[in-house]
A protein has these predicted regions:
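Periplasmic alpha-helical coiled-coil/stalk elements that build and connect Gram-negative outer-membrane
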Residues: 2-3, 133-252, 348-351, 355
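Bacterial N-terminal signal peptides that target proteins for export
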Residues: 2-16
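Acidic, low-complexity, intrinsically disordered peripheral segments
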Residues: 3-6, 30, 41, 222, ...
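N-terminal signal peptide c-region/cleavage motif recognized by signal peptidases
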Residues: 24-26
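Bacterial Sec-pathway N-terminal export signals of envelope proteins
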Residues: 29-75, 80, 88, 105-106, ...
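Small/polar, glycine/serine/threonine/aspartate-rich low-complexity segments that form flexible
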Residues: 30-34, 77-111, 115, 230-243, ...
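A glycine-/polar-enriched beta->alpha junction
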Residues: 42-52, 59-74, 92, 100-117, ...
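Amphipathic alpha-helical coiled-coil segments
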Residues: 53-65, 133, 137-158, 167, ...
Length: 432
């Protein structure tokens, strides 16, 4: 029976050992790049391709502002005879025909300025979209850095417990050979170690996509390096931090959030578009001068040409109505956006207050005491002062408690990050 148990556990143990070895080798083989949050933000601003593309979009829209202000080019028209009864290209004063006209389109009702205003609105919208992209990607970067640190803390809990159990298992193997303990007790502890090692594999695997996203955001040329965040927050300060008034936070969010600004810019665009569509209903004037050598009633005729469309069949009423309805539509979108911003800020504040209540300084003291108690329990089991069942139960409870505390601490930090994100500026300093 004992041999059967050993055979059953041998294969999964060997498999897990291989997986752990490969993962550990992969993590250890990587160069470790310790990175402060300000350094990460600097590299992100300099190197991120999405931000670079958005900057070019702003420049492209600015070029259209200059283009919209330009006048239309003058038009040169000419009509010259090729052949008449006297021969080819006879353009002297006595025979032949030459006709030349130069005309210029003059846009009325301030169409050029109104079109330039629309181009300016598009540029402002591109800036708002850039700022919103920056806000979103920065939030993703900082969240990923804090999440990597969270996973590394979890890994540290497992590493510490696994290291202690490996020492214990090594000693128990010697005791088993001496016949001082049973195979069952030896296998129970090894099974506990096996489960912890298996859970550690999942923790290390969870870090890989986070690192990949951080590398993608930073684009700093260190794709093969393991980025280890260096964070400077003090948890007791975060637990006791006092938030600004809700209404103040909401007003700040409404004023500063780029997506809110973008909605207001789009409303401005629709208002300016209505003015432009009304201007399009006004006819433009084409003015020119012409010279006619022989075709007119008088030789060498010089005249003034004026033309304009008659505003009878098309007064641009459809586009004007479309612009009016677009204003109403965008106003509804803006009202909904403002309501959503207020709701998101309120939810972020509620989360912080909840996790500040859940986390407390007594928990930090309890965690430190629990670490000491784990060492005492390990020593007591080695000295046969507690049973195997008590030791295993305590080990599971110790691990679960440590992980729950870490999750609660990280939840508070994420809630604070979320508030900064929803307001659109750092109202709470987390990393010092």
């Amino acid at each position: 029976m004992n041999k059967y148990i050993r055979d059953k556990l041998r294969l999964p143990a060997i498999t897990l050992a291989v997986v752990l070895s490969l993962l550990s080798h992969s993590l250890c083989a990587q160069d470790t790049l310790s990175l402060l949050v300000p350094e990460a933000e600097k590299e992100f601003l300099q190197n991120n391709f999405s931000l670079l593309a958005a900057k070019y979009n702003i420049d492209a829209n600015r070029a259209l502002i200059k283009q919209a202000r330009l006048w239309d080019n003058p038009i040169l028209s000419t009509d010259q005879n090729i052949y008449d009864q006297q021969g080819f290209f006879k353009h002297n004063n006595n025979s032949g025909q030459v006709y030349v006209q130069v005309s210029q389109l003059i846009k009325t009702a301030g169409k050029r300025n109104k079109l330039a205003t629309l181009a300016q609105d598009n540029t402002t919208l591109a800036i708002d979209q850039f700022d919103d992209l920056l806000r979103t990607l920065r939030f993703s970067l900082i969240s990923d850095l804090f999440e990597v640190e969270h996973q590394l803390k979890i890994k540290k809990v497992y590493d510490s417990e696994i290291a202690q159990l490996e020492i214990l298992v090594k000693g128990m193997d010697a005791q088993l050979q001496a016949g001082n303990i049973s195979v069952k007790d030896n296998m129970r502890v090894k099974a506990l170690l096996f489960n912890l090692q298996n859970e550690l594999v999942n923790i290390e695997a969870a870090i890989i996509p986070l690192e990949s996203e951080i590398h993608l955001l930073l684009n700093n040329g260190h794709d093969s390096a393991f980025i280890k965040p260096v964070l400077g927050y003090h948890l007791p300060d975060l637990i006791n931090t006092t938030l600004p008034e809700r209404q103040q936070l909401i007003q700040q969010a409404l004023a500063t959030r780029p997506d809110g600004k973008a909605a207001r810019t789009q409303l401005d665009y629709q208002s300016h578009n209505l003015a432009y569509q009304k201007a399009l209903a006004k006819p433009d004037v084409n003015i020119g001068t012409e010279f006619d050598q022989h075709s007119s009633y008088s030789p060498n005729y010089i005249g003034l040409a004026v033309s304009l469309p008659l505003n009878i069949l098309n007064r641009n009423k459809g586009n004007i109505a479309n612009a009016q309805y677009s204003i109403r539509q965008q106003q509804a979108i803006l009202d909904g956006q403002n309501q959503r911003i207020s709701s998101e800020v309120n939810a972020a504040v509620d989360q912080i207050l909840f996790y500040q209540k859940v986390n407390n300084l007594q928990q930090l003291e309890f965690s430190q005491q629990y670490d000491t108690l784990f060492q005492n329990m390990l020593s007591s089991y080695q000295q046969r002062q507690v049973s195997l069942l008590e030791f295993i139960d305590f080990t599971d409870a110790y691990k679960d408690s440590k992980l729950k505390l870490l999750d609660q601490h990280t939840a508070l930090i994420k809630a604070l990050l979320e508030l900064n994100f929803q307001v659109g500026k750092d109202v709470i300093t987390i990393n010092k």
